[in-house]
Every structure is written in C-alpha cells, then in structure tokens.
C-alpha cells in the first residue's frame, strides 16, 4: 500500500473544516498571558536565598553545644561540703513526714484497707514501709505518744464498795511488810 502524505488543507482528515478568526485584541491579550505564564515557570524571586538562610539557622541551632558560651562562674577552689546541723536534719525530717502524710497514693491505699479490701503483697509491703517510716519520724521528732497496753484491764470490783470499806482496807494495810 502506498503512503499518503499529510496535508494541512481544511478538507484533510483530522484538521478542522472551519477557520476561526479572532480579532487582534483577543490575540494580543492571549499572547501576553502566555508570555507572563512562561516567565513565571520557576520559583519566586529570591526564594532560593531566604530558604537557605532559614535552613542554615535551623541547622546551626541544632548543632550548637549548649555548654559553650556559658556565663556561669566556675569556682577554682572546691569548698568542703559542710554537714547538716541537727536543726536542719530535724527540719528535713519534718518535711519528709509532711510529704508522707500528704502522699495521695498512700492515702488511697489506707482508705481501701479501711474499707476491708485486701491489697496485693506489693501494695501491702509499700503501705507497711511507709507507715513504719512515719512512725520512726514521729518518734524522732517526739510526736509519738507511748503506746499503752490494750490488754491491761482494771481489776474487777467485787460488789459495790463504799468509801468507808475502802478506808478500812487502807487502815488495815501493814506497811512494815513492804520495807526492804
């Protein structure tokens, strides 16, 4: 089969059969718009420089060692550490006691115990340690009252005795028996 040459004639296949005529002003406006769009293909002017500056600033901020350039004075002679006085230690014991009494977790666990709930071994151990520490601190600060024996009971009164009977018993006591 022989080859057929393409032609630009309006009757040829693929080419429009009618010709559009535009007036001069439309063509000029379109041309200017195309030219302007062609000029603005790339990035905005100066964007290369401003982006690079920002990146350099960020990189410099990340790389800079915070220890360099410190204005803090460095002592050349090491001074010996003085021990805390008894009053300072007492103050710190008071602070520790205050912290333990205000411990939210300990308070919640104590509330659970009072409600009759059984705690796990770890939580029970934690509560016991904290309560022991509170007791030691209170004893150290002199806030702990000596415990009285709860098992001690007053001797049972045999019947009702009046003052005359008690006075008679007192008079009958022989104090010579108690001399050593």
Curated annotation (Swiss-Prot):
InterPro entries found in the cross-reference section: YihI (IPR007336)
Biased composition (Basic residues): 33-43
Region (Disordered): 1-90, 145-180
Keywords, alphabetical: GTPase activation, Ribosome biogenesis
GO molecular function, one term: GTPase activator activity
Biased composition regions of type Acidic residues, renumbered to the chain: 165-180
Pfam families cross-referenced by the UniProt entry: YihI
Compositionally biased spans, kind Basic and acidic residues: 23-32, 50-68, 80-90
Gene Ontology process terms (BP): ribosome biogenesis
Family: Belongs to the YihI family.
Assembly description: Interacts with Der.
NCBIfam families: PRK05244.1-1 (NF003560)
HAMAP family hit by this protein: GAP_YihI (MF_01058)
Purpose: A GTPase-activating protein (GAP) that modifies Der/EngA GTPase function. May play a role in ribosome biogenesis.
The name this protein goes by in its record: Der GTPase-activating protein YihI
Species of provenance: Vibrio campbellii (strain ATCC BAA-1116)
Originating gene: yihI
């Amino acid at each position: 089969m022989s080859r057929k040459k393409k032609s630009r004639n309006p009757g040829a296949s693929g080419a429009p059969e009618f010709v559009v005529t535009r007036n001069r002003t439309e063509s000029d406006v379109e041309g200017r718009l195309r030219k302007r769009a062609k000029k603005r293909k790339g990035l905005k002017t100066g964007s290369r420089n401003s982006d690079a500056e920002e990146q350099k600033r960020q990189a410099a901020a990340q790389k800079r060692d915070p220890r360099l350039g410190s204005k803090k004075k460095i002592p050349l002679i090491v001074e010996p550490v003085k021990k805390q006085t008894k009053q300072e230690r007492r103050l710190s014991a008071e602070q520790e006691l205050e912290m333990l009494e205000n411990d939210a977790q300990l308070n919640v666990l104590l509330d659970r115990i009072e409600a009759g709930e059984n705690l796990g071994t770890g939580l029970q151990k934690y509560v016991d340690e904290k309560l022991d520490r509170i007791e030691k601190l209170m004893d150290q600060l002199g806030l702990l009252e000596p415990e009285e024996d709860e098992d001690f009971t007053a001797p049972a009164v045999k019947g009702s005795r009046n003052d005359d009977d008690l006075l008679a018993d007192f008079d009958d006591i022989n104090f010579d028996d108690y001399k050593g």
